[in-house]
């Protein structure tokens, strides 16, 4: 992701998130149009429990700006949870960020 930002001269800003209750998001990308919360999972499976930090950050952001909630994982299928979080295979996520 850092390489994409540099190579494509995107000008993205990076941070992370942790709430007082311990909910975390590994990477937050701020683009000109969007805020993208990314939780990175090493496994091949994801579950609704993996969405906790993204949902917490989404509640904080509210409707102030468009917020995409992504989990990037080593699985093969793109998934969408009922709470709006999307799970992306690594390669598909990198292509989508371009």
Task: For each feature predicted by the language model, list its residue ranges.
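A cross-kingdom feature that marks ATP-driven nucleic-acid transaction machinery
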Residues: 1-98
């Amino acid at each position: 992701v850092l390489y994409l930002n540099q190579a494509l001269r995107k000008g993205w800003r990076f941070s992370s998130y942790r709430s007082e209750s311990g909910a975390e998001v590994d990477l937050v990308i701020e683009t000109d149009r969007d805020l993208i919360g990314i939780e990175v999972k090493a496994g091949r499976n994801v579950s609704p429990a993996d969405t906790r930090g993204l949902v917490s950050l989404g509640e904080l952001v509210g409707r102030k700006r468009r917020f995409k909630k992504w989990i990037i994982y080593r699985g093969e299928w793109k998934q969408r949870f009922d709470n709006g979080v999307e799970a992306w295979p690594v390669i598909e996520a990198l292509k989508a960020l371009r």
